[in-house]
Amino acid sequence: MRAIETVKVGIAEMKVVVAPTVIRTCGLGSCVGVVIYDSGKALAGMAHVMLPHSSMARGGVVNEAKYADTAVEALCKLVIAAGGRKAMLKAKLAGGAQMFSFSSTSGDMMRIGARNVEEVKRQLERLHIPVVAEDVGGHSGRTIEFNPQTGMLSIRTASQEIKEI
């Protein structure tokens, strides 16, 4: 039996795979792992989003995969270019944890995880891509792996608990 190939997505990266290849990203704390897929075509794209808005970039060229407001649409385009059908696309999300406690005076700026999740969902809604499952928030880091053949997203938390959505 042949081993299934796994493509790794690094921080602020996005990639697309076709089954039987699976796609994985590690180290999701406040970052969000976004999977956009077409189950009928057994293909999926994943982005490892770090921050909510590209307006936070400091000059130069913006890495689209790094920011929720640019990554979702760019990932959607990659999935369609690989053969995905816009009307059939669905999304799954994981991450967006609040990894550290801050005093209430730090306000909204320190809610990076929650703001990442909110912006990813806003962009998916704008593109009419339904979120069919999610495992977001909390205080634990996650590693996720998506199998485009089965449509299952496996989530391993820092405590080694594994969940499938």
Swiss-Prot record:
Keywords: Chemotaxis, Hydrolase
Catalytic activity: L-glutaminyl-[protein] + H2O = L-glutamyl-[protein] + NH4(+)
Matching CDD domains: CheD
InterPro entries according to UniProt: CheD-like_sf (IPR038592), Chemorcpt_Glu_NH3ase_CheD (IPR005659), Cytotoxic_necrot_fac-like_cat (IPR011324)
A molecular function GO annotation: protein-glutamine glutaminase activity
A GO biological-process term: chemotaxis
Alphabetical list of Pfam families matching this protein: CheD
Domain of life: Bacteria
EC number annotated for this UniProt entry: 3.5.1.44
UniProt entry tagged with the keyword Hydrolase: yes
Gene3D superfamilies per UniProt: 3.30.1330.200
General function of this protein: Probably deamidates glutamine residues to glutamate on methyl-accepting chemotaxis receptors (MCPs), playing an important role in chemotaxis.
Family per record: Belongs to the CheD family.
Record-linked PANTHER family: CHEMORECEPTOR GLUTAMINE DEAMIDASE CHED-RELATED
UniProt-recorded name of the protein: Probable chemoreceptor glutamine deamidase CheD
Native organism: Geobacillus thermodenitrificans (strain NG80-2)
Protein encoded by which gene: cheD
